Amino acid sequence: MIRSIFKKNSSLPYFLKRSFITKPHSIITPIINNNNHNNNNINTPIKNIQSFNFKFFTTTTTSNPIHQQTTTTTTTTPSTEQQQLSKEAEEINENITKYNITLTDSCVKELNSVQKKSDSTDIFLRVMVDMGGCSGYQYIIKVENKLQDDDVLFIRNGAKVIIDKISLEMMEGSIIDYETALMRSSFVVASNPNTIKSCGCKISFELKK
């Protein structure tokens, strides 16, 4: 395209014609030789065209292949309520490990059923040891909706069992179950390694000395 501008009869010198036959992206910058150009006479025509030196500069755009990536790390601080729930869960796990209290599947199922039928979401099965019965001690098992200060909480799949600390000294390692019988269905302490014997009703027992 640039070649077509300069015809054979053009009055421009030949070297100028060649100067314009360059790459399309070249920039032609004339450098005036101050020795041949009189700055005092601006209107004087430049006769010696060879006093112009032409330099060609090519503009190149270089892209950096390395792109810096900014990684934003979001740190979420648990709320006070979440921290409290987490702390309670840790305490419950410690209780299960420390006292080795087992809640059977039937116990969990029945206790969850009782909780669904109740208006309160806080339903606990209290198991405690009291003096009495035919063997000297007896279990008292009942459903409550309040925790006492000395209660230790055990939870499995939503079922909550509470045992006071004094009773736990005589019940460590016990298994709490729900038994269904023809005459009577109830929560029972199915096994207690701290006892010597228990009566057939599984309510009264004798402790090891």
Curated annotation (Swiss-Prot):
Pfam families: Fe-S_biosyn. Involved in the maturation of mitochondrial 4Fe-4S proteins functioning late in the iron-sulfur cluster assembly pathway. May be involved in the binding of an intermediate of Fe/S cluster assembly. Binds 2 iron ions per dimer. Fe cation binds at C134, C199, C201. This is Iron-sulfur cluster assembly 2 homolog, mitochondrial. Its cofactor is Fe cation. GO terms for molecular function: 2 iron, 2 sulfur cluster binding; 4 iron, 4 sulfur cluster binding; iron ion binding. Residues 1-27 form a transit peptide. Its main location: mitochondrion. GO terms for cellular component: mitochondrion. One of its GO terms (biological process) is iron-sulfur cluster assembly.
